[in-house]
Structures are given as structure tokens and as C-alpha cells.
């Protein structure tokens, strides 16, 4: 029998979970990381003192022996070590592929540029309310392979999947899969919208039912739905039979399935049109997986939303403050501006900026001109945002987020909302988007 040697590519939380999985399965493996100071290195060496670790490069004689590379999604597929392993005949896949090969319980698979975590968490809560033993994992929370120890405890997996994870997954057969929306993101990695969309579309392969956004052509399955695959859609308009949407009656907007009104939107806690879409998607996914409508609607009425995602902070002198630090790309910020601006009388003072990931900030011009009073900019790509939007609304610069909060307070009028929705990644100034949101929230609480 051929001896298999696995290469774990990338340390960090995912890499550690892959190493534990391989050890449980008595597999031989070595570890590689592109960074000299790999995160989790000390913890790894403590747990696996005898496993060879290669930092920054892996010797050719090791690569030539590798049969399988299990890589963290953060590592680009054109990284030289992965290229060398591929040319030497190794199979390359990720932790979600390992999970797919191991489990028999049904999977709900969720991707999209924005709203993934909200929808994944919502569906998980609906499943829990219905009495399912549910694992909520993937691009959210605990790495999936760390949950495999307890696989026999789960009757359902709800997986949030990024485009990077989907690029590395081949065997997943979800009971229902969705792409919520696709707007430009990660183009520094995928290079083109076509490649990014292609990665997202992989989620539909092998799915028994697919849910797509009928207002977003990128989410429509490329393979037209075969007879044995159920196709469901959601959108802002009134839905046809079996699909999901909004119905307005006597000045009240309802979430609806077909002609059936399910719930007035004011009775759900997550606010803004984009969150109504998230709620519809969660309802459709949960129902497709066999969860009763009673449990679905009960959870919708009580779900408070996730931190750093259009999260209400407080009101000061008639001005509302909202933390949308998770708005790390243009699509998320457009959703937040349209969703919040469309449901209020005043204007938005927008705090934005950070690392733009190659995005075109001109796309913000239309919603900004409609709903935004002024913009306060921070971070690495402030110049690019200013040159795209300075002719649309007044733009001010701040050297820190705390400074931006102080400036925004002077720009806002009673009835306005100050919205932190950066349209950028946070790593130029912060540990991550959570850290950025926490700094904003504590600054606002100090006003």
C-alpha cells in the first residue's frame, strides 16, 4: 500500500484543526506556513513536538513525497509551495472537503459576499428552536474539523462558506445551498468578477435544492435547474408561488412566501431592507431543511442580529450611531447605506476607509448622493475614496477612528445617523473588523 504524506499548508486556527484531524486518523503529515512568525506556532509545537514545520519554504524532497495538501483558505492557490505540490501530483483541498467526506448528516450551505454570518446564525437558531442538534460552522466560529469529534451528536450542519473555502471543496452535497448576493470583493485574490462568481457557484454542485436571489444575476445557478433539483428564489418584490419576497398591504410591509403573509417587517429586530432579505433567505433555507414555520417565525421575532453588522450603539443629542464594522467591502456598505437611509427621515454621516482590496469606490457614488450628508475618512485608501466621492458630498479626513467619531459628531444634525461602514478591510489600523468595531463603540459610548 502506498504511504500517504499530508502537507498542512497554513497554521492558525484552521491549520491546527487540520493537524488534530490528521493525528486522530493516524496520518503522517508535515506543516508549512508562508510567514516567519506563523500564528499559533508555539501552540502547535507544544501539541505536536515531533511534526516537522517549514516556514516560508518547503524543501523539494519533501514536496516530492507529499500525496495530499490540506490548505487553509487564507493561502492563495498560486502560492509557490501549492503550485509545486500540484505539479508533483498532490491533491489539494481544504478542511470543508475533509468534513464532506466524513459526515452523513444533512448540510445547509450558505455563501454570498454579504449577510453570510447573519443568515447562517439565524438558520442555526431556527434549527435549535426546532429541536435539531445543529453544528453552525465553516467561515464562522470554531473550525469544522474541531467539531468532528462530536459528529454523531449533530443531525444538521449549517455551514457558512467563503469563496476561498469553496475553491477547495469538491464532495459537498448540501440538502439546500444558497448564494445570497455577489458584489466585488477579494478581487486582489480572484482577480476578476468572473473568477469570484465561479468560486461562489461551486456551492450549488451536488445540492438537492438551491436558493438564489432573483435580483442578482450572479447568484442564479449557471447550470439551469435540472428536474430533480428544487429551485427557490427570494427578492424584494412580491413572490410567485413557492418563492419568497415582500408584500405591501395597507402601508405595512410583510415577509411573504407566495401570497402568504408571514410577518410584518416591523416585528423583526434586525433592521434595514438588506436584513429583510437576510430574514427571507434564512426562512427559505430553514423550511427547505424541514424546520417548521412556527419555529422559523418565533426565532425571527427575537433574533437581535450580530455584533458589528448594522448594530445600534446609542443615540446622542438626537443622532443615532450605528456600528457596521463588518462592512469590509463596497457591496456591504451600499447595502447598509440603502437599508438604513431608505428607512429614516434624516441623513447619514458615513465613516469609511481602510484597505480597499482593489475595489472601485465610484460604485458608492449613487447611494452616497441619495442618503449621505458627509463622509469622514480614515485609513490607507482614504485618498482613493476621496477622489471617487469628493464631488458628490463633503469629505473630511481623520487620522484615527476616535478622531473620526469626534468629527462626525460635529457634522451630524438631529435626526441623522452616524454610520461606521468602512467599505474596506481593517488590517492597516486594527487587528480585525471586531477590533475596529469595538474602538468605534467605546468612542461613541464616551461621547
Curated annotation (Swiss-Prot):
Intracellular or extracellular location(s): Cytoplasm
Keyword Cell cycle: yes
Protein keywords: ATP-binding, Cell cycle, Cell division, Cell shape, Cell wall biogenesis/degradation, Cytoplasm, Ligase, Nucleotide-binding, Peptidoglycan synthesis
Molecular-function annotations in GO: ATP binding; UDP-N-acetylmuramoylalanine-D-glutamate ligase activity
Gene Ontology biological-process annotations: cell division; cell wall organization; peptidoglycan biosynthetic process; regulation of cell shape
GO CC, alphabetical: cytoplasm
Gene3D superfamilies with a match to the protein in the record: Mur ligase, C-terminal domain (3.90.190.20), Mur-like, catalytic domain (3.40.1190.10), NAD(P)-binding Rossmann-like Domain (3.40.50.720)
EC number: 6.3.2.9
Main location: cytoplasm
Principal EC category: ligase
Superkingdom: Bacteria
Family annotation (InterPro entries): Mur-like_cat_sf, Mur_ligase_C, Mur_ligase_C_dom_sf, Mur_ligase_cen, MurD
Catalytic reactions on record: UDP-N-acetyl-alpha-D-muramoyl-L-alanine + D-glutamate + ATP = UDP-N-acetyl-alpha-D-muramoyl-L-alanyl-D-glutamate + ADP + phosphate + H(+)
Pathway: Cell wall biogenesis; peptidoglycan biosynthesis
Binding site for ATP: 112-118
NCBIfam families with a match to the protein in the record: murD
Functional description taken from the UniProt entry: Cell wall formation. Catalyzes the addition of glutamate to the nucleotide precursor UDP-N-acetylmuramoyl-L-alanine (UMA).
Family: Belongs to the MurCDEF family.
Name of the protein in question: UDP-N-acetylmuramoylalanine--D-glutamate ligase
Lineage of origin: Bacteria, Pseudomonadati, Pseudomonadota, Gammaproteobacteria, Legionellales
Amino acid at each position: 500500500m502506498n504511504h500517504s504524506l499530508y502537507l498542512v499548508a497554513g497554521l492558525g486556527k484552521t491549520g491546527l484543526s487540520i493537524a488534530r484531524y490528521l493525528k486522530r486518523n493516524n496520518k503522517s503529515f508535515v506543516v508549512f506556513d508562508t510567514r516567519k512568525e506563523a500564528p499559533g506556532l508555539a501552540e502547535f509545537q507544544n501539541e505536536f513536538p515531533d511534526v516537522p514545520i517549514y516556514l516560508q519554504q518547503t524543501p523539494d524532497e519533501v514536496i516530492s513525497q507529499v500525496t495530499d495538501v490540506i490548505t487553509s483558505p487564507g493561502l492563495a492557490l498560486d502560492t509557490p509551495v501549492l503550485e509545486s505540490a500540484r505539479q508533483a501530483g498532490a491533491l489539494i483541498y481544504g478542511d470543508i472537503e475533509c468534513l464532506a467526506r466524513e459526515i452523513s448528516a444533512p448540510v445547509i450551505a450558505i455563501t454570498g459576499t454579504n449577510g453570510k454570518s447573519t443568515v447562517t446564525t439565524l438558520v442555526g437558531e431556527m434549527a435549535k428552536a426546532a429541536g435539531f442538534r445543529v453544528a453552525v460552522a465553516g467561515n464562522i466560529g470554531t473550525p469544522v474539523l474541531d467539531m468532528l469529534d462530536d459528529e454523531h451528536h449533530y443531525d444538521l450542519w449549517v455551514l457558512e462558506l467563503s469563496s476561498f473555502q469553496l475553491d477547495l471543496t469538491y464532495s459537498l452535497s448540501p440538502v439546500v445551498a444558497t448564494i445570497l448576493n455577489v458584489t466585488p470583493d477579494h478581487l486582489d485574490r480572484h482577480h476578476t468578477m468572473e473568477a469570484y462568481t465561479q468560486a461562489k457557484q461551486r456551492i450549488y454542485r451536488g445540492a438537492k435544492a438551491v436558493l438564489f436571489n432573483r435580483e442578482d444575476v450572479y447568484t442564479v445557478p449557471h447550470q439551469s435547474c435540472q428536474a430533480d433539483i428544487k429551485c427557490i428564489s427570494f427578492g424584494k418584490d412580491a413572490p410567485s408561488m413557492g418563492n419568497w419576497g415582500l408584500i405591501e398591504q395597507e402601508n405595512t410591509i410583510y415577509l411573504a412566501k407566495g401570497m402568504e403573509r408571514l410577518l410584518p417587517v416591523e416585528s423583526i429586530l434586525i433592521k434595514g431592507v438588506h436584513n429583510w432579505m437576510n430574514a427571507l433567505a434564512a426562512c427559505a433555507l430553514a423550511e427547505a431543511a424541514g424546520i417548521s414555520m412556527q419555529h422559523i417565525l418565533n426565532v425571527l421575532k427575537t433574533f437581535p442580529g450580530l455584533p458589528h453588522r448594522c448594530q445600534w450603539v446609542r443615540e446622542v443629542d438626537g443622532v443615532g450611531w450605528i456600528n457596521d464594522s463588518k462592512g469590509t467591502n463596497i457591496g456591504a456598505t451600499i447595502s447598509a447605506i440603502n437599508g438604513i437611509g431608505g428607512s429614516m427621515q434624516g441623513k447619514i454621516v458615513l465613516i469609511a476607509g481602510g484597505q480597499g482590496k482593489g475595489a472601485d469606490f465610484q460604485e458608492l457614488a449613487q447611494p452616497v448622493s441619495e442618503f449621505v450628508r458627509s463622509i469622514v475618512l480614515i485609513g490607507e485608501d482614504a485618498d482613493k475614496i476621496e477622489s471617487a466621492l469628493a464631488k458628490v458630498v463633503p469629505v473630511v479626513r481623520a487620522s484615527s477612528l476616535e478622531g473620526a467619531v469626534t468629527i462626525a459628531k460635529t457634522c451630524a444634525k438631529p435626526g441623522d445617523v452616524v454610520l461606521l461602514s468602512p467599505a474596506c478591510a481593517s488590517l492597516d489600523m486594527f487587528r480585525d473588523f471586531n477590533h475596529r468595531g469595538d474602538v468605534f463603540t467605546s468612542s461613541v459610548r464616551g461621547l
